[in-house]
């Protein structure tokens, strides 16, 4: 009798212990779920801020690109002696060619806040962090250095003209005539325009274009992660009509002449190309494509037009960008 009672009590105690352990484990699991949920909510909020900053930055970058395209055209006209006194007289905007610049510094508050909360970043988004670091550290810092050099050249030109040419700071008819004569006929001014074009139009604006083109697929990635349903901003490249009906034709793996494998995939209604990287991370940013017409796409990182190639059965078998021909290696039967 006593042995039976002891056995029952022992089994009961073991059962109680098991129930307590299960309760503790469930409580820990629930706590982990809650903590993960809080972390994911915070991470999403941080990404929303990064997304909004990048959207603004890309819009500003686009405006700078357009501005320096005009400056490039103007510099070429000056260097080639195509502008007369009357050209300067009739368009005052031309008078300030080498004396002004339009800078650009990125809005990195959202990015910095994200980097200060790395404990909230899920492991599956490590590649995203690599891409953001490239955008906001490598590319943005190169752009900043280039802007510093460019700004110093412009400020030096302003100082030199202010000290040597009285008409520079005057706006009367006599001073204006001297200004126009100098800009139209002085050979040194042409050299100054060359310097401006090199460090401003060709250098600084080149880094701005790199930031913009690299940021386009990154913006789409962020948009997908935060599940943003708003229309893309107006500056974003547009696909030609009919994209949805043919986009699946282009998806898949491709092989370059030097042996690199490329993957064309779709993200938020656009095609992008990235290298099929073996390892933890891909250090080469993806390239956004926008459709010009059926089988023709603009590569927004290189500026080239990709022409997809089809076989007799109308299947896509590769593409050419005018320099290289890339072969599709997963053509379905």
Q: Where is each model-derived feature located?
A:
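Long, hydrophobic alpha-helical segments that serve as membrane-spanning/inserting helices
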Residues: 1-11, 32-242, 266
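A generic fold-level signal
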Residues: 12-14, 300
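Hydrophobic membrane-insertion alpha-helices, especially the h-region
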Residues: 14-29
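Peripheral terminal and inter-domain segments
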Residues: 230-333
């Amino acid at each position: 009798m006593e042995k039976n009672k002891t056995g029952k009590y022992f089994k009961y105690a073991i059962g109680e212990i098991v129930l307590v352990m299960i309760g503790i484990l469930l409580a820990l699991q629930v706590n982990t779920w809650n903590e993960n949920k809080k972390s994911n909510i915070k991470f999403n909020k941080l990404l929303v801020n990064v997304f909004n900053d990048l959207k603004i930055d890309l819009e500003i970058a686009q405006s700078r690109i357009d501005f320096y395209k005009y400056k490039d055209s103007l510099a070429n006209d000056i260097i080639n002696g195509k502008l007369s006194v009357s050209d300067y007289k009739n368009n005052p905007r031309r008078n300030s060619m080498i004396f002004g610049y339009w800078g650009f510094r990125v809005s990195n508050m959202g990015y910095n806040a994200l980097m200060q909360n790395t404990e909230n970043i899920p492991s599956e988004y490590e590649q995203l962090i690599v891409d953001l670091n490239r955008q906001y550290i490598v590319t943005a810092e190169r752009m900043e250095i280039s802007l510093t050099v460019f700004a110093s050249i412009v400020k030096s030109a302003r100082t030199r003209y202010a000290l040597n040419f009285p008409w520079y700071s005057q706006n009367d008819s006599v001073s204006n005539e001297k200004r126009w004569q100098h800009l139209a006929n002085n050979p040194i001014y042409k050299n100054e325009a060359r310097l401006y074009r090199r460090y401003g139009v060709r250098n600084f604006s080149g880094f701005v274009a790199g930031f913009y083109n690299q940021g386009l697929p990154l913006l789409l990635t962020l948009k997908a992660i935060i599940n943003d349903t708003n229309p893309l901003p107006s500056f974003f490249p547009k696909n030609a009509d009919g994209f949805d009906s043919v986009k699946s034709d282009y998806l898949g793996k491709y092989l370059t002449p030097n042996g690199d494998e490329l993957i064309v995939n779709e993200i938020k209604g656009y095609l992008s190309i990235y290298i099929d990287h073996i390892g933890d991370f891909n250090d080469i940013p993806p390239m956004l494509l926008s459709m010009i017409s059926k089988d023709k796409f603009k590569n927004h990182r290189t500026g080239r037009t990709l022409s997809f190639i089809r076989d007799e059965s109308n299947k896509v078998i590769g593409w050419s960008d005018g320099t290289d021909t890339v072969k599709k290696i997963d053509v379905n039967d």
